[in-house]
Amino acid sequence: MKDIFNFFEKPKDPLSFSAIRISLASPDKIRQWSHGEVKKPETINYRTFKPERDGLFCAKIFGPVKDYECNCGKYKRMKHRGVVCEKCGVEVIQSKVRRERLGHITLATPVAHIWFLKSLPSRIGNLLDITLKDLEKVLYCESYIVIDPKETTFQRGELLSEDRYQKALDEFGDDAFSAGMGGEAVLGLLRGVGPASKEHGEGIPGLANELRAEMKEATSDAKRKKIAKRLKVVEAFVASGNKPEWMMLEVIPVIPPDLRPLVPLDGGRFATSDLNDLYRRVINRNNRLKRLQELNAPDIIIRNEKRMLQEAVDALFDNGRRGKTITGPNKRPLKSLSDMLKGKQGRFRQNLLGKRVDYSGRSVIVVGPELKLHQCGLPKIMALELFKPFIYNKLEEKGYVTTIKSAKKMVEKERPEVWDILDEVIREHPVLLNRAPTLHRLGIQAFEPVLIEGKAIQLHPLVCTAFNADFDGDQMAVHVPLSIEAQMEARVLMMSTNNILSPAHGKPIIVPSQDIVLGIYYMTRERAFARGEGKVFASPEEVRAAYDQGEVDLQAKVWVRMDGKRVETTVGRVLLYDIVPRRLSFESINKVMDKKQLQGLIDLTYRLCGEKETVLLADRVRSMGYGNATRAGISIALDNMVIPRKKVDLLERATREVDDIQAQYTEGLITIGERYNKVIDIWAQVTEEVAQEMMGEIGTETAVGTGKDGKREERRQPSFNPIYIMADSGARGSAQQIRQLAGMRGLMAKPSGEIIETPITANFREGLNVLQYFISTHGARKGLADTALKTANSGYLTRRLVDVAQDAIITEYDCGAMDGITLGALVEGGEIIEPMGERILGRVALDDMLDPFSGNVLVKANEEIDEGKVKLIENAGIDKVKIRSVLTCQARRGICVECYGRDLARGRKVNIGEAVGVIAAQSIGEPGTQLTMRTFHIGGAASRRAEQSTIENRNAGLIKFNNVSVAKKRDGTLIVMNRNGEIIVTDDQGRERERYGVVYGAKLLVREGQKVEANQLLAEWDPYSMPIITEVAGRVKYGDLVDGVTISEQVDEITGLARKAVIASKDPDARPRISIKDEEGRTKKLANSDADARYMLPEGANLVVNDGDEVDAGDVIAKMPRETTKTKDITGGLPRVAELFEARKPKEHAVISEIDGVVAFGKDTKGKRKVVITPEVDSKLRPDLAKEYLIGKGKHISVHTGDRVRAGEALMDGAANPHDILRVLGEKELARWLVDEVQEVYRLQGVKINDKHIETIVRQMLRRVRIVDVGDTEFLADEQVEKFAFEEENERVLKAGGRAAQGEPLLLGITKASLSTESFISASSFQETTKVLTEAAISGKVDYLRGLKENVIMGRLVPAGTGLGAYKHLDIEVETPVDAVEEAEEALAVGAEE
C-alpha cells in the first residue's frame, strides 16, 4: 500500500521511477490499497463539523482532521505519534494522510465498469462476442443470458426473454441449464471465457489460438476484420496478465476525502465536490440492495435496485456516458471521475500541463526607447515583491536585521537600505518576460531588469516583433528564475540578445520597424537642391563637422573620399556608416535603406561580425532611427492623398468596355459566367491602372531650385509625400491601403466570397456614398467574424502539431542514412518562386557535389551547405542537389544532427537535445494565428489578379516542344490537343532556360525551332472556359443528347437566346456524346490511332455546335465553364493547412494512374466510364498488365485516347488524394507534394517557413506501416505498427530463418498520429482521454517516459536540451581559487628564478 503512495508523494530523487504502467485493478488489489470500508453515506455532522464514523469522511479510515490529534481529543501533540485511539479508532498522525488514503465500498452485486462496457468498441462485448445492445439488456436486468447450457439446446451466451426463460424452466426443469441476469451473469461469463473446443488450450490463451486458426480459414474480408478486432482485445489480455473478470467491479475504491473536499460556507451551508454526491448515491443504493437481499424481497424489486446500483456506479465513473445525465440540485450535470481528467479543465491540461507559477507578476507594457537590447524596465514595487526572499537573505547577511520577521517589517516600510539591496540583488539576475498568447518560443525571453519608477514594464522596441506586442494596452508577465541553473539557462539560451534569428526561417527577427525604419529611410534619401549639394569632403569626419555646423543638409548629395576612393553619396548615409561595423563595406549602406534593406543589413552583420556586433548595431540603429524620425517631422494631411488626374478617363473607358461585354452577352456570343468573369477582370485591371497612376503621381514630384549656373531649374525626384514615404520605407501601410485612400477601393467580396461585379469607384478621400458604404461593410464585418473564429482554429492546429511532433528530438550525431531528397528551384508557371539556394541553405549534402565543367568537388558528402557553398553551387550552374533530410533519417528515436542540418535560430549545426519537433510545430502554427488575424486589415477589398491566359517567355532563345500534339486548323493556326505538353525555351548551347506547361486547347503562336525575342507571346487560351476540341474534320452527330433528359435548353432571360447545356440524367446508361461522321455517315477515326472520333460530354458542358454542323480539326465543339474565381484569403488557407496535415481525403478527389502507359477507353459500366491504361514494355504494349479505372459520368476526364500518362498523373479534374500519392509514388514524392502544398498557402500570405519544419511534421505522420502479409511475425493482418518496431521484428524473424512480414507505408493525420503514439500518458492528455486510458489499461501498457509531454505530466525534467539524460550524470570538477592562486604564485616564482 505504501508503495503506491510514494508514487504520489514528491519523489525525493526525480529518477525514482523510469516507467509507468497502467492496468486493471483486481478486487483484492483494491482491498489491499484500502484503509477501511465506507458503509454509510453520511459526510460530516452538521453541528460539530466532525466527520461521521464509517461515512465518506470518516477519520478512522482516512486519518485525523487535525495534525496529530485524534477525533475525540484524547490524544494530542507529537508525542503520541502513531498511536491508535481506542475510543474513536483514529490513528494520531499528520492530517495530510487524508490526501492519500483510499477507502472502499463492497458492492452487493458485481457491476460493469462503464469504460469497458461503453467505450467503443465495447471490450466486454468483444471478449464475450455479444453485441453491446444485448449486453446492456443483461446488465440492466431486462433479459436473461445462458451461462451454461448443459444438456439443453441453448447456446452459451444466448439471450432469453422473461417468457422464454420461464418456458424453458417449465420444459427442462430448474437444474437443466444455468442462466442469469445482471452483473453476476456477465461476471460468470467473463470468468469462463475460453475457446469453443478444447484442442486449442484453456482460457484466454486458448481463445487467442482459436481465433488465430479461424482467421487463417476465414474467406471474406469482413469476417477477417471482425476476427482481427476481437483478437486484438484477446491478445491484449494475454499479454498484460489482466483477468477479464476485473472489468466487472465487486469493490469500488473511494478516493481520499481531501481530494473531494466539503467546505463550510458562511450561513451554515456547505460547498461540496460533486464526487461526494455520486458516492452517496452509490452507497445508498448499495445498502438498500443489501437490505432487500437480506429480506428476500421479490425478484422484481431486487432487479430494479441492481439496475439502479449499476446506473449509480456508471454515473460515478463517467456521468452522462449512458442514459440520462445525473444532475445536482441546481440542474447542473455532476462532474464524475472521468470529467476530472477530460478536456481543457481536466486534471491533465489544467493542472499537469499548465500550472500557475510563483514569483511572477504582470503589468501593462510601455516602450523603453533608451534600453539596451538585453534590458527591460521593471517597476520598483514589482521588483521588491518578486525578489523578496533574496532581499531578506541579503538584509540578514549584511546584519541589518536578525530575523525574517524584522526583515519583513523593514521591507514593508521601504527603508532606503532596502532599495540599495534591491539594486544589488537584481544585478545580473535575469527575469523572463512573457506575452500571451505564447505562439512560439520567442514569446518568452529573458532580460536584465533595470529598476524604474512607475508601474508599467518597459519593453525594448526591437523585441516587439517576436512578442507580437504593441503598446495599446498589452500586458506582459514577469517570472523570476530562482535556481542558479535556471538563471544560467535564462542568460545563455533565452536572453533576447541570443535570439536574434527566427527559428522559423533563419532570418533576423530583431528588425527595425515603424518609426525606426522611417527615420533611417528619411536620412538615407536624397533631396534635389539641398543645401551643400555637390560639395566634396576628404573624410567622413569632415562631413560630420559640416553637418553639425549646419553647412550641409541631411539629404544633400555630396562626394566623400572613402578608403581611397571618391564616392557619390549623401550626408545621411555617411552618418549612418558611422554606426555600422567596419567589416561592412560602404556599398552595403550607400542606398536608400528601407525595411528590407535594414533586415539585410542586420543579417549581413550577424553573418560577418557575429552576435555581439549585431546587438550593438541594432541598438545604434534604433537610437538613430528614432532621432531622425523625430527630426523629420512627418505628418499626414488631406492633401497628401493625391487623386490621379487620369482616374476619370480610366473609369469611363472601363464602363464602355463593360457595356460592350453586356452587348455581346445580349447577342448570345458569351455565357453568363463568361460575362461575369470578363466584367470582373476589366474592373480588376482598371483598379490596378488607377493605383499605378496614383503611385506614379504620389511617388514622384518636381523639385524646383537654382542650378549651378544660378538659373532656375526643375528636376523630377522620388517624392517626399509623407504617406508615400511611410509605405515605400515599409514603416506602415501598404500600396494596397494607399490605393483605397487615393485611388479607388475597387471590387468588393460578398460574405460568401464571391466578388460583387460593381466596384466601388470612390476612394476614402472622396468619400463613399450610401450604397458603396453598404457594400464595404460586408467585407469589413466578415473580416472581424473570421478573425474570431480563425484564432481558435489556428490555436487548435498548433496544439495538434505540437502534440504530434513533441517527441522529435535530436538524439544522435549521425544516423548513417544513405538516402536523401533532391531539391531544385521551385518553379511555378515558368517563374522561379524560390531559388534553389534558399532551399538548400543550412542543409547537409548527401553525396560529393561536383562542378559539372571542371569536375572539382564543391561540397563534400555530409558537409553543411553554408552561404559560401550556395554561391559556389549557383555559379557552377547546378540545378538539382541531393541533400540529407529529416524524412530519410534512420535514427531509431528522434532525429540526427546531419539529417536536420542547421539550427536556424543559431546559424550553425543543431545541438543534440534540441526539441526540433516542437520548434517545427510552433513555426508552422504561429503564422497561422497571425494570418488569421490579418484578414480584415484590407477591409475585404477583393484582391484578385486577372486570370493568366497567355504565356510569355522571359529570355530570348529557341523554342522546343516537349510532348505537344497539335491539330492544324484551316487558317494554319495550331491548337494544342493534349494536356501535359510543355514549351521549352533553350539558349544557343541548347541549355534549358525556362519551361512552361501548355493548356489543352491553347493556340500556339510559335513553331518548333523558332527563334524568339524576350517577352514574346508564345501561346494564348480562353481563361474562362475549358474547351472540348475535335481532332478531325467532319459533320457533327449528337449521341444520347435528348432535350430535357441529358441536355437542357436554357433560354437566357436577359438575351432571349437558347443555350444547350448537358445535365445529369436519371438514366444510368445514357452517355451524352458528340461523334464526328464522314460523308457516308460513318464515324471517323482519330489520326494515328484506330479509336473513333467520339467525344463524351461531362455535366455542365455548353454545346457550341448543333447537330449536323460541319466542323474542322481544332474547332471547339463544347465548352466547360471554369468556376468563377473567389478571392484567396488565408480563410482558404488555414483549413487547407489543417486538411493537409490531417491527411484528409478530398471530397471529389482525382483518380490517378498507378502506372506509366497509354490511355484508351474501355466499355462503360453502370454509368461509369472506363479508362484503361496499358503499359509499354520495350516499346511494345502489354494489355495483360493494363490497369482499369472507373470514373463517374459527370466528371470531366482530362486525358484523351492515345495520351501517354505517367504514374501518379490525374486522369480527371479534382484535388489530389495524399493517400493515393503515397501508394503510387512513394513516401518521398508524397512528402514533396505535402511540403509544396503547405508552403503555397503560406507563400500567398508572404510568410516564410523553412521546408525542414514541414518535413519534420510529415516524418511524424509517416511513422507507421500497415501489415499486408504477416509472414512468421507476431503481427496481425491490417495492424498498424511503428516503422522501427516493424523492422526490428522482421530482423528477428529473418535471423530465426522465418518469413518476414510485408507492410505498406501509412500516412496518418496529425490527430491520429498523436493518439497512436507509444506513450499513453501523452495520448490521453491530448484527446479522447477515456478511450486512450481504457485501451492502455486493458493491454497493460508501459510508458517509458521518452517524450516531452509525459515527463512534464510526471513532474520531471524534459528529456531535451539541458534535461537530456546525458547531462544528469556529469561530474563537475571545481578548482578551488586558492589552489589556482598558489599555482600561479609558484609559476611566477619559478619564472623569476630563471
UniProtKB/Swiss-Prot annotation:
Magnesium is among the record's keywords: yes
Entry cofactors: Mg(2+); Zn(2+)
Pfam family, one: RNA_pol_Rpb1_4
Binding site for Zn(2+) 2: 815, 889, 896, 899
Binding of Mg(2+), residues: 470, 472, 474
InterPro entries cross-referenced by the UniProt entry: DNA-dir_RpoC_beta_prime (IPR045867), DNA-dir_RpoC_beta_prime_bact (IPR012754), RNA_pol_asu (IPR000722), RNA_pol_N (IPR006592), RNA_pol_Rpb1_1 (IPR007080), RNA_pol_Rpb1_3 (IPR007066), RNA_pol_Rpb1_3_sf (IPR042102), RNA_pol_Rpb1_4 (IPR007083)
GO biological process, one term: DNA-templated transcription
GO MF assignments: DNA binding; DNA-directed RNA polymerase activity; magnesium ion binding; zinc ion binding
EC number: 2.7.7.6
Gene3D superfamilies in the cross-refs: 1.10.132.30, 1.10.150.390, 1.10.1790.20, 1.10.40.90, 2.40.40.20, 2.40.50.100, RNA polymerase II, clamp domain, RNA polymerase Rpb1, domain 3
Ligand binding (Zn(2+) 1): 70, 72, 85, 88
Cellular compartments per GO CC: DNA-directed RNA polymerase complex
Catalytic activity: RNA(n) + a ribonucleoside 5'-triphosphate = RNA(n+1) + diphosphate
Textual note on the cofactor: Binds 1 Mg(2+) ion per subunit.
Top EC class, one word: transferase
CDD domains associated with the record: RNAP_beta'_C, RNAP_beta'_N
Entry keywords, A to Z: DNA-directed RNA polymerase, Magnesium, Metal-binding, Nucleotidyltransferase, Transcription, Transferase, Zinc
Family named by the database record: Belongs to the RNA polymerase beta' chain family.
Its biological purpose: DNA-dependent RNA polymerase catalyzes the transcription of DNA into RNA using the four ribonucleoside triphosphates as substrates.
Subunit structure comment from the entry: The RNAP catalytic core consists of 2 alpha, 1 beta, 1 beta' and 1 omega subunit. When a sigma factor is associated with the core the holoenzyme is formed, which can initiate transcription.
NCBIfam families for the chain: rpoC_TIGR (TIGR02386)
Protein name: DNA-directed RNA polymerase subunit beta'
Organism per entry: Anaeromyxobacter sp. (strain K)
Name of the encoding gene: rpoC
